[in-house]
Amino acid sequence: MNQNKPVIINGIPCYSPQVDSQHNDYPESGLKKLYELESKHFWFISRYEFIIKTITKRTNSNCRFIEIGAGTGNVSRKLMDKGFKPAVGEIHLSGLQYAKSYGITECYQFDLYNTPFSDCYDAIGLFDVLEHLDKPEKALSNINSMLRDNGLLYITVPAHMWLWNKYDRLAGHKIRYTKPSLIQVAQQANFDIIECRYFFIFITPLLWLRSKLHPDKHLEATIQEEDSEIHVNTMINKTLLAICRLENLINHLLPNIFGGSLILVVRKRANKDNI
């Protein structure tokens, strides 16, 4: 646990300011693109809608909630629309500046491998973060210590290595998970499993096709290739958003065997000394 006093930079408590410039697990340059596209791109919209639906089903808006690895804070921004008052944690200061622009006031810069908080949150969100980490077990163990007894952790990750493509590597991914492998990592960190489901099921064939058209050959992508991955034709974007929203409505009825992503809900085991 990081017991150092934070350095205040641009009004943000920074517990690991030296790590910001050295951190390579997620490219800081991607945050600007995220900020520009998260409110427009079908993938981001349907993703946060599915996450919000999952969270509000199990967690009250008056709880102490923090999103870790929050990027620009877009998911927390949407939680605010549901009455939550979330905090956000992020390694990159630039991401926290974007979060502040959304009206999120409680922002912290820290390293997930050296967290500054203990036993103080009722629920935590970790959305598309775990796949960037070399030591996911350590990160989840640290998150466990941040939660109060019986606190909930919500996780999303990309699914299936057979969907791996060059854009995974360019995004800083280390792995794509399966349901069993994600559950195993969480259980090793002393969590009890509540729910684990695949989503982005309907577009999985398109994601498979992408993996074949853009395999990871360890070559650098051109700016044009990176832009083509992010920018989608308006009509195609609207169509895919409609498809994903339909899936979100009936996801609980679909076979839970594959999908482009996974969502995992786990609970911290109560400390027997406190029972």
Model-derived regions: residue spans:
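Residues lining the SAM
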Residues: 127-130, 156
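Conserved N-terminal segment of class I S-adenosyl-L-methionine
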Residues: 1-127, 138-140, 225, 229-234, ...
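Conserved S-adenosyl-L-methionine
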Residues: 191-201
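C-terminal helical/coil "lid" or tail adjacent to the Rossmann-like core of SAM-dependent
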Residues: 206-242
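Short, P/G- and charge-enriched loop/turn segments at secondary-structure junctions
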Residues: 39, 248-254
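Short, glycine-/aromatic-enriched active-site segment of Class I SAM-dependent methyltransferases
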Residues: 35-36, 153-175, 179-187
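A short glycine-rich, Lys/Arg-flanked "PGG" loop and its adjoining helix->strand segment in the class I
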Residues: 137-152
